[in-house]
Amino acid sequence: MVVKINENYLKLKSSYLFVEVARREAEFQKNNPDADIIKMGIGDVTKPLAPSVIKAFQGAVDEMGNADTFRGYGPEQGYDFLAEEIIKNDFEPFGVSLDTDEVFISDGAKCDTGNIQEIFDLGNKIAVTDPVYTVYVDTNVMAGRTGEMKDDGMYEGLTYLKCNAENGFVPELPEEDVDIIYLCYPNNPTGTTLTYDQLKVFVDYAIEHKAIILFDAAYECFIREDDVPHTIYEIEGAKNVAIEFRSFSKMAGFTGTRCAYTVVPKEVAGYDSKGNEVQLNQLWNRRQTTKFNGVSYPVQVAAAAVYSDDGKKEIKEIIDYYMENAKVIKSSLEKLGLEVYGGVNSPYIWVKTPNNMDSWAFFDLLLNEANVVGTPGSGFGPSGEGYLRLTAFNTLENTKEAMDRISKLNF
């Protein structure tokens, strides 16, 4: 008698993309201990939490140290005081009304975008953009919705919607019927966006085909242009077909504090084997109350402070700081004659590698010759080959230094 494993895990690539990036970086640092490496790969932030957030955080911790104000287990879905602030500030300004029980507070959009697939049948046909945030793909592989990875880097059973310079990084509708479509805009990794009309095409498809859109809007706060939707629910009919994911990680520096939320409107539904309509809100609530104990009270208080008058001002300054970095990266690389995308409504810059160099070769060149770490585009899918992602989350000083180093390279 032996314990059998979930063999779907064996279908995955040998290591998670960012683990391999970190491994190569660590190996280089070990061999070059004096090298000053500038990290512009993984999307971690460098600015500290805003003062108003810290003040609220500390106040909530003090409450936890007092018997009269101590709080134990909180509601798995999150406290209403935070959900109310989210609705008031993130949705109502765009004409979207929600109830608090449609907002689920969590410890990360990565967790939610990975876990949401649990409420769907394994037989559903999945579509992802290519390149893509790898969590969408890997979690469906783990669940058993795909076959093996083919020689072209694509998994059997997944539908890939190519995004490249030729189509302006706007994915075409799937040629075959699909049940679930993952979209991320502003996009990770390409930094590009969809207009209202372009997003409406997908919403209309989902309505017609009774499909579900899983819409990752983790980078909404970086939107600068007018014709870019801030939430998918600005599109007519989207409440019937879309689940939206948001995060405080990049918006407010919560990468180490952990807080996010998922919106599951009561209108959005799936179907059981008998064809009966089932609210996805109920299923997600059941999943969360079973597997998740909720985000800590101090963290939720800190997140709510993001929406205070002082918090909004402080957060805007931080976001503007990162977007200035993005501007520096984009303009510097364009001056070198490189093709550069993103960086306008997003902290991500998507760079075409010079001289048809492959992604990992360009990664190694920047690491070895400029001591700058990016993320190889091929790690995000076959259509990412020949690109490299840089992030705007380092300091302005380091960002300028990195661009200066790269400008001295001979491509």
Swiss-Prot record:
It comes from the Archaea. Pathway: Amino-acid biosynthesis; L-lysine biosynthesis via DAP pathway; LL-2,6-diaminopimelate from (S)-tetrahydrodipicolinate (aminotransferase route): step 1/1. Disulfide bonds: none annotated. Pyridoxal 5'-phosphate binds at Y73, A109, K110, Y133, N188, Y219, S247, F248, S249, R258, N293. It catalyses: (2S,6S)-2,6-diaminopimelate + 2-oxoglutarate = (S)-2,3,4,5-tetrahydrodipicolinate + L-glutamate + H2O + H(+). Substrate binds at Y16, G43, K110, Y133, N188, N293, R389. GO terms for biological process: lysine biosynthetic process via diaminopimelate, diaminopimelate-aminotransferase pathway. It is an enzyme of class 2 (transferase). Involved in the synthesis of meso-diaminopimelate (m-DAP or DL-DAP), required for both lysine and peptidoglycan biosynthesis. Catalyzes the direct conversion of tetrahydrodipicolinate to LL-diaminopimelate. Homodimer. This is LL-diaminopimelate aminotransferase.
